[in-house]
């Protein structure tokens, strides 16, 4: 179980209250698929992922990026029990989709990069620390079924 300070809770809540899901989600997933091309194998049904331009312009990638980012809402709303909040998604990704659990960390890094670019100077070291702690808890929860 993750221990959260009041300040960390406030930072996470503030990030999500200002989150531009329609911008950050597609950019983060696109970045992950471009920077780590082996992650594309899980998205073969998404159509043309031939190059960066195709990935960035792919409506299926954009829609899934938004869905993934909204999936983080579950963790934000259940910060005291993140592991249990993601049990069903962990099972889906491990047993049905067979996603390499390392991919969750890669995507979380891409989300952090895109969020930092969007927030600019407001993305302080303290903000980054709280956000990465949150994402690490989500990544761990999503990988729970693999252990």
From Swiss-Prot:
GO biological process: hydrogen peroxide catabolic process
Pfam families: Globin
Residues binding heme b, per UniProt: 64, 93
Gene3D superfamilies tied to this protein: Globins
Key words, A-Z: Heme, Iron, Metal-binding, Oxygen transport, Transport
Signal sequence extent: none
GO MF annotation, one: heme binding
GO cellular component: blood microparticle; haptoglobin-hemoglobin complex; hemoglobin complex
Tissue specificity statement from the Swiss-Prot or TrEMBL entry: Red blood cells.
Described function: Involved in oxygen transport from gills to the various peripheral tissues.
Protein name stated in the entry: Hemoglobin subunit beta
Biological source species: Trematomus newnesi
Higher taxonomy: Eukaryota, Metazoa, Chordata, Craniata, Vertebrata
């Amino acid at each position: 179980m993750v221990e959260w300070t009041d300040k960390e809770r406030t930072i996470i809540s503030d990030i999500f209250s200002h989150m531009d899901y329609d911008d950050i989600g597609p950019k983060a997933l696109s970045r992950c698929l471009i920077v780590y091309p082996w992650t594309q194998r899980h998205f073969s049904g998404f159509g043309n992922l031939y190059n960066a331009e195709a990935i960035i312009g792919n409506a299926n990638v954009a829609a899934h990026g938004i869905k993934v980012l909204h999936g983080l809402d579950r963790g934000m709303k259940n910060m005291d029990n993140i592991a249990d909040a993601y049990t069903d998604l962990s099972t889906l990704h491990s047993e049905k989709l067979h996603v390499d659990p390392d991919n969750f960390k890669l995507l979380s890094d891409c989300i952090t990069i895109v969020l930092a670019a969007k927030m600019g100077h407001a993305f302080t070291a303290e903000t980054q620390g709280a956000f990465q702690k949150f994402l690490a808890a989500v990544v761990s929860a999503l990988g729970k079924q693999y252990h």
